[in-house]
């Protein structure tokens, strides 16, 4: 049985033009929790999807400044993880968890 903490680490798949391009190199992009470490992300992906992960790269996308009714606000920062899968394995992110 999967640990419920794995669902707290992986927030959602990131479906963008760039993420569909890197899927050809056997990589998948996820939005992850801000406090998640690379070993936690690797363990969560392997447990939830049943695949072998070879590498995890992370980045933090800074939130943009937005104006609403004359007041400046800021969108939240988002942490993303680019997960490289072992050769011959894949994840269909459109089906969900």
Curated annotation (Swiss-Prot):
GO terms for biological process: translation. GO terms for cellular component: ribonucleoprotein complex; ribosome. It comes from the Bacteria. One of its GO terms (molecular function) is rRNA binding. The keyword DNA damage does not apply. The keyword Ribonucleoprotein applies. One of the early assembly proteins it binds 23S rRNA. One of the proteins that surrounds the polypeptide exit tunnel on the outside of the ribosome. Forms the main docking site for trigger factor binding to the ribosome. Belongs to the universal ribosomal protein uL23 family. This is Large ribosomal subunit protein uL23.
